[in-house]
Amino acid sequence: MAGDPRGFAPLEPARHRVGERTELYDGTVTVDHWFTVPIDHALGLAEAEAQDAAGTGVGPHGRGTLTVFAREIRAKDDPGGERPWALYLQGGPGSAGPRPARLSGWLGALAESHRVLLLDQRGTGRSTPATVATLTAPGAFATDEAR
């Protein structure tokens, strides 16, 4: 959106990679997903990836992007993933999304009507880690005036 007062770049899709599909012992299907996104919301993905190539980003080793991991959970009666999405955000701070061995409890109940996406938020689980290098990189907390 042009003129966003927060300084965010126009919304564009993240780069998405679908990973391993696993069937758990109770028939539950899990699918791994990785999303590449800009570290700095003022940049579009192409600009952030150019920073990766040039080593000029605000992340560790000049990275301009980070990867966010999510695991999709499908009930055994929805192996093709036709149900609508429900996104689960783990409480924090610093915890990865749950890694169920079988469907039960709240997750089992939700999976009766939805595919559930268990997100490892930035810096947790299998997403790009938040480290001292990430948090102390030059420009990691740049103000809008400094851009």
Cite the ranges covered by each PLM segment.
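N-terminal presequences and immediately downstream first alpha-helices
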Residues: M1-H16
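Gly/Pro-rich cap/lid or specificity-loop segments adjacent to the active site
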Residues: A9-E12, E20-R147
